Amino acid sequence: MDRSTDLDIQELKMTREQYILATQQNNLPRPENAQLYPVGIYGWRKRCLYFFVLLLLVTMIVNLAMTIWILKVMNFTVDGMGNLRVTKKGIRLEGISEFLLPLYVKEIHSRKDSPLVLQSDRNVTVNARNHMGQLTGQLTVGAEAVEAQCKRFEVRASEDGRVLFSADEDEITIGAEKLKVTGTEGAVFGHSVETPHIRAEPSQDLRLESPTRSLKMEAPRGVQVSAAAGDFKATCRKELHLQSTEGEIFLNADSIRLGNLPIGSFSSSTSSSNSRQTVYELCVCPNGKLYLSPAGVGSTCQSSSSICLWN
């Protein structure tokens, strides 16, 4: 009975609400004792909704502020970001740029009014690879050495592209007009040296020295040593050999002097022992030795001289 009564009351309320809505739309007069039932979100649900809307608004404001700050700090523009500019020819970097990971590029150019500087705390390594990814060349600039690993290393002139220095497994070529060594110890060569011309600096002496071994100069078509405005001296501690296997030894000068030649003795009844001897005769022993003998009316050379008998 109570349940049916409640259902009747609810149906009555719904009928009254429909009547009220109909009278509002048709501008009909409402009864004085009509009751309104509000429809919406009230209580703690309304407070939670306002809180979430306020939190979302604050989050949007903070996000917008952070976005504006990042754009300002990173210097975002239409052309690029910060020191990075995107152009038709590629990417342009202004100022100092740091790369934390490997950089793969085809060409690197600096500005026309400034040099290109590559800097690293440890070393700078430039690698060249083929289409299969294999290493074909490497240039490493370290704190103690500069190393280049390649099949052939070349240094060319900037004007005409002439090769100034090249090195490979077989040979090292120096294409400069002049090789200058300014070290105090000079140039040290462990093996033979082939060159068409050796010349000293103007007003400087040229010295070829082997401190502990012998020094040899060989040429199939001759060796020429000339001193146009000075003396030529050859000194040694022991023997000095001048040998020509098929030709001759030619001495051509206004005067030829042979110093410290031994003087042989010659006894003759006609010679005056008291007179001072000023003229000597140059004698040659059978073994090729030279000595001086006092000049007389005839030849004073004797093959049995004591000088010729010396070893």
From Swiss-Prot:
Q: Where does this polypeptide localize?
A: Cell membrane, Sarcolemma; Cytoplasm, Cytoskeleton
- Could you list the residue ranges forming a coiled coil in this record? none
Q: List the disulfide bonds.
A: 285-301
The residues that carry sugar chains are: 75, 123
Bilayer-spanning residue ranges:
51-71
**Residue intervals annotated with topology Cytoplasmic:** 1-50
- Topological type in the membrane: Single-pass type II membrane protein
Identify the tissues in which this protein is expressed: Expressed in the heart, skeletal muscle and arterial vascular smooth muscle.
The answer to whether UniProt assigns keyword Hydrolase to this entry is no
Chief subcellular site? membrane
UniProt entry keywords in alphabetical sequence: Cell membrane, Cytoplasm, Cytoskeleton, Disulfide bond, Glycoprotein, Membrane, Signal-anchor, Transmembrane, Transmembrane helix
Q: Name one GO cellular component term.
A: cytoskeleton
State which ranges are Extracellular (membrane side).
72-311
What function does this protein fulfil?
Answer: Component of the sarcoglycan complex, a subcomplex of the dystrophin-glycoprotein complex which forms a link between the F-actin cytoskeleton and the extracellular matrix. May play a role in the maintenance of striated muscle membrane stability.
The UniProt family comment states: Belongs to the sarcoglycan beta/delta/gamma/zeta family.
Recorded protein name is Zeta-sarcoglycan
Species:
Mus musculus (Mouse)
